[in-house]
């Protein structure tokens, strides 16, 4: 389960819901996944972990499109964080975990926390940002908005392929982040 192309299709289908300020509930997510995969989760064509990742990708697409504008429209980082919290509040929560996600320790950074980390890091356009366990790119998107160059690492094949779609100018590698200093 979980090839990148249908997950990108799902993410693109979810973006208009985010743009309209609508919550992505399980029914909307299931419908988008069934349309992209041509089957339900009960068929084994996709799993809920994939659906949650597609919703994360939709948030990243939103920030790719509107993140820099959102930052310019606010006078303080707290106001930007409030906007990020609103966006994250529209996304579904990860209520189901796959055995692979537990085994690979795939626990996504919540979008508001990623925004706080990015603010603390103070990404600039002359930075090269290494994300050793990039996941779907929830932290990397903030570095991209700042204009930084990206070196993204992700062990999971589907997530790595998603990163390639989302951050075409980034170097994407597949090292085991537990031994990335070797």
Task: Cite the ranges covered by each PLM segment.
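Class I S-adenosyl-L-methionine-dependent methyltransferase catalytic core
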Residues: 1-182
């Amino acid at each position: 389960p979980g090839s990148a192309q249908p997950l990108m299709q799902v993410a693109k289908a979810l973006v208009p819901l985010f743009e309209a300020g609508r919550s992505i509930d399980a029914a909307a997510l299931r419908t988008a996944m069934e349309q992209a995969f041509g089957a339900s989760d009960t068929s084994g064509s996709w799993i809920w972990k994939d659906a949650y990742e597609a919703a994360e990708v939709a948030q990243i697409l939103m920030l790719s499109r509107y993140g820099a504008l959102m930052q310019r429209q606010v006078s303080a980082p707290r106001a930007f964080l409030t906007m990020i919290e609103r966006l994250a509040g529209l996304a579904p929560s990860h209520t189901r975990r796959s055995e692979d996600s537990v085994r690979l320790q795939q626990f996504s950074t919540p979008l508001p926390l990623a925004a706080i980390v990015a603010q603390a890091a103070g990404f600039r356009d002359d930075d090269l940002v290494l994300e050793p366990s990039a996941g779907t790119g929830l932290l990397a998107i903030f570095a991209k908005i700042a204009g930084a160059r990206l070196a993204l690492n992700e062990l999971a094949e589907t997530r790595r392929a998603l990163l390639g779609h989302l951050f075409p100018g980034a170097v994407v590698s597949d090292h085991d982040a537990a031994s990335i200093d070797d």
